[in-house]
């Protein structure tokens, strides 16, 4: 028995060490199989961490879980479900999500991890000195009376020497009622760890915005804005955070919110990306048109109007009013929407872009439209004006037409696609510049990286895409901090700095530190979606945590909930289902 246990500890440590060394070398692999039904994955710092909902854990950790079942095996899962909780829902037969191990099995794995790191276990065949591995966390099925859903182990090191280990137990229950007392939690911690004094730290999270699906055909975006507040000490359970707290806005925004004020601009960006992909791959996936008339009809009418007017000013005004009216919607906050009206100074090329980007559905459309334009320029039917600074092929032809001579352009191959892409880039860059400078959120110097014409056209498109995401972030936050210009300015600079150094990432969470006094109206009369108290003394690893939340923080368990027909749709936190988490720990000294 002991020999088998020793071999198991040696093998488990060896497999974990191999995975850890691969991670340090930058080798990313899928979870490895430890046993037939057990897999281990290493979560790197910055990756989505399932423990963040409980311990605000965001460092590198090992996660041990059950191997997902094959689809044909899922029909047997109901026999394994406990009375109060159930392993993740298999009804769809698709991705079943993470799965938990029995609590007994989890304890065995924690025991092997502990044995392997114990310097007193000199009989183990492990190379010395033992490498201190990242914390190990095991998903549990909550099958014990305590409702254990996680077991964890984290090493204690002193001067690069392993001196002990902290063992964590996380439990979770779903209930409509809760009963807990702060003093009782403090006394529990004192008694468990033989302490005379303790410190408490509070945390509250307020969900300011979370996108929802418009209907069954349009899925919800991943946009989410939350206000996180921390403070110390804590006076009582569910204490409203004091104004002396530390507060941070956590912002994750997915571009293209269907009901947002930037929807029309995002549609133009999507068309720009279609052209860029077509130029790069030779295959163009055209968008559905927004106009009933064909692109050729719209361009011909546009040219006729210019010819009749013998000028450009009135035409610009007319198109601007039409576009503004077209994109107006009562669903959008008008105070924000007023910032995003179509510019009143659209030149010929920009108006042409607006018409063609909403109606072109084929390569033939491009060729026919540009043929009409070039013929009108050659005949002198129109002499449109342009903004200065454009290096597009169309602008060069227009400037040449002023002098009665034009280069011959062969509208074949990728040339028509590139011509439209160039004028679209010019137009969108000016749109973004107009907003950022007009709102005094950035200078041309700040924006130089995003609008520089010196890089190749594909990189220009990519940088404009980044700039659009920054704009989406600001628009999403404006309802909450619109009156706080310094906060909008700070957020703009944070985003600009990030995107100068990193690739486009709409899953990235941008963090904006704020003063509680500046956002007190957002939380003082609201119920938090998550409220947590941590009690500790001395080492912060040694702590007791109690948390209340209105959604399950455990992604591998489904809780049987009471009948929601009894609950009000907009009820307070007390009227909805609760999820209470308790984290306790014990410390083991090796030396």
UniProtKB/Swiss-Prot annotation:
Query: What is the role of the protein in this entry?
Result: Essential component of the mitotic checkpoint, which prevents cells from prematurely exiting mitosis. Required for the assembly of the dynein-dynactin and MAD1-MAD2 complexes onto kinetochores. Its function related to the spindle assembly machinery is proposed to depend on its association in the mitotic RZZ complex.
Q: Which organism is it from?
A: Homo sapiens (Human)
What does the record's miscellaneous section state? ZWILCH gene is deleted in a patient suffering from colorectal cancer with chromosomal instability.
The main place the protein resides is nucleus
**Name of the protein in question:** Protein zwilch homolog
Concerning its family, UniProt says:
Belongs to the ZWILCH family.
Q: Name its cellular compartments.
A: Chromosome, Centromere, Kinetochore
Provide the assembly information: Component of the RZZ complex composed of KNTC1/ROD, ZW10 and ZWILCH; in the complex interacts directly with KNTC1/ROD.
Quote a single Gene Ontology cellular component term: kinetochore microtubule
Q: Which GO BP terms, alphabetically?
A: cell division; mitotic spindle assembly checkpoint signaling; protein localization to kinetochore; regulation of attachment of spindle microtubules to kinetochore
Which Pfam family name is an example for this entry?
A: Zwilch
- InterPro entries for the chain: Zwilch
Alphabetized, the UniProt keywords read: Cell cycle, Cell division, Centromere, Chromosome, Kinetochore, Mitosis, Phosphoprotein
Q: Where are the transmembrane segments?
A: none
Q: Which residues carry this modification: Phosphoserine?
A: 88
PANTHER family reported for this sequence = PROTEIN ZWILCH HOMOLOG (PTHR15995:SF1)
- Asked whether the keyword Cell division is assigned, the reply is yes
